[in-house]
């Protein structure tokens, strides 16, 4: 392992991982550079990992991604990923606020579909606005939420997002992105939408739905993983698919997923979050 603590090399390695990680002046568990969790219910297997990108580690900054899941009742699962905007100033704090607000809201709702997805997004946006007041733009964050309902055929999924955090279906080694335009927007240099809604003038909210078959995985990713996944169809995509293949059996642990999320790849220095769901 390199002094910079990077995980596996997927593609050309990043030279930045050769530098030792400096000791941060201030660190608390809630702002850890490495986070991982997971578990199983009667209907779902869930694994999540979030790691600070090498750029943040070397500059002594926290991971500015956040994730959460909620299991309000049997057969229902909500999963959320947010990516705080580094240039905003307090993006990591905004991601934490958005995820926490949506998580709490979804634990109490009656319905479980597109309307609830959109309501959770609005609740998250309002929470970020209220926390930041006139400076709410400093808390800017992307946001993606998926509501999963167990069914005999697999699982029904409803999603909503703002920004470039995304969602994929993984079947064996095939990745299908559920929101259109990810790669095209990157090429055009499009302005990324964020919460709070309206802070950038035209933050488009997108929705999607899919039937997740048995054996497939729903994978939510921050752009620190989604971008290299799209750019590396012969490296990152098959390597991550191989890692995730151990999820349903229990062979993949949260710590092993965090190690994979910390892959070394030239030019990829952003924070990375992976949240994967398999119906049982």
Identify the residue ranges that each predicted region occupies.
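Catalytic core of PPM/PP2C metal-dependent serine/threonine phosphatase domains
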Residues: 110-172, 200-211, 277
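Generic enzyme active-site microenvironment
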Residues: 81, 162, 221
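PP2C/PPM family metal-dependent serine/threonine protein phosphatase catalytic domain
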Residues: 48-61, 125-136, 169-209, 213, ...
């Amino acid at each position: 392992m390199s002094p910079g603590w990077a995980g596996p090399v997927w593609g050309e390695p990043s030279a930045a991982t050769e530098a030792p990680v400096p000791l941060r002046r201030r660190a608390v568990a809630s702002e850890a550079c490495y986070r991982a969790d997971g578990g199983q219910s009667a209907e779902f297997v869930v694994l999540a990992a979030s790691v600070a990108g090498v750029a943040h580690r070397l500059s002594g900054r926290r991971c500015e991604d956040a994730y959460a899941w909620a299991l309000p009742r049997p057969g229902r699962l909500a999963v959320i990923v947010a990516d705080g905007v580094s240039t905003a100033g307090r993006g990591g704090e905004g991601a934490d606020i958005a995820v926490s607000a949506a998580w709490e809201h979804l634990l109490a709702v009656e319905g479980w579909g597109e309307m609830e997805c959109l309501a959770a997004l609005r609740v998250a946006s309002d929470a970020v606005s209220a926390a930041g007041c006139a400076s709410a733009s400093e808390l800017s964050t992307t946001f993606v939420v998926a509501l999963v309902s167990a069914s005999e055929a697999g699982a029904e999924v409803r999603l909503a997002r703002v920004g470039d955090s995304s969602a994929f279906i993984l079947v064996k080694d095939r990745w299908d992105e559920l929101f259109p335009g990810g790669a095209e927007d990157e090429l055009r240099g499009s302005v990324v939408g964020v919460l709070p809604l309206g802070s950038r003038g035209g933050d488009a909210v997108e929705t999607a739905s899919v039937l997740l078959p048995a054996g497939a995985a729903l994978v939510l990713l921050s752009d620190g993983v989604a971008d290299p996944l799209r750019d590396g169809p012969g490296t990152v995509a098959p390597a991550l698919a191989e890692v995730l293949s151990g999820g349903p059996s229990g062979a993949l642990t949260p710590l092993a997923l965090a190690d994979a999320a910390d892959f070394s790849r030239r030019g990829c220095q952003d924070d990375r979050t992976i949240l994967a769901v398999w119906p049982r």
